Amino acid sequence: MFFGEFEYKLDEKGRFPLPPAIRPSLKDGLILAPGTGEKCIYAYPLCEWKKLAESLKSTTVAPSKMRRLNRALFALAFDVNLDAQGRLTLPAPLKTYAGVNIEVIVAGVNNYLEIWDKETWESEKKASQEQAWQIIETLEEH
């Protein structure tokens, strides 16, 4: 499980370290994909990515919509590994997609991580915090 918010600056090669506490969860690999509907990068441990892929196979969404979703997730995904110092290099297409400049935020989101440009994250975090109580109330009603 991933949680917390971590702030980093990209080095001259576009790398940043991931928190040491989460690195063991990523030892088998990491899949980076564009956030769906959000200007961020999803970072899934390989085992979680495989679970996501399997769950999508059994969904009852219309085939044309499923093809679009698969293209959005899988065609633009990258299989990456951390270097010996625990650093991650963001692929240029994903870096551009998410508008990542120098300052990045890594946010733990349960079974995956999200990588955001710091400025974009601040706006998203505020919106999420403002809506969280409404979502919780809806969950409590069911």
From Swiss-Prot:
InterPro entries: MraZ, MraZ_C, MraZ_dom, MraZ_N, MraZ_sf, SpoVT-AbrB_dom, SpoVT-AbrB_sf. Disulfide bonds: none annotated. It holds the Pfam family MraZ. Residues 5-48, 77-120 form the SpoVT-AbrB domain. GO terms for cellular component: cytoplasm; nucleoid. Signal peptide: none annotated. GO terms for biological process: negative regulation of DNA-templated transcription initiation. PROSITE patterns: SPOVT_ABRB. Its main location: cytoplasm. It comes from the Bacteria. It is found in: Cytoplasm, Nucleoid. Belongs to the MraZ family. Forms oligomers. NCBIfam families: division/cell wall cluster transcriptional repressor MraZ. This is Transcriptional regulator MraZ. It comes from Dehalococcoides mccartyi (strain ATCC BAA-2100 / JCM 16839 / KCTC 5957 / BAV1).
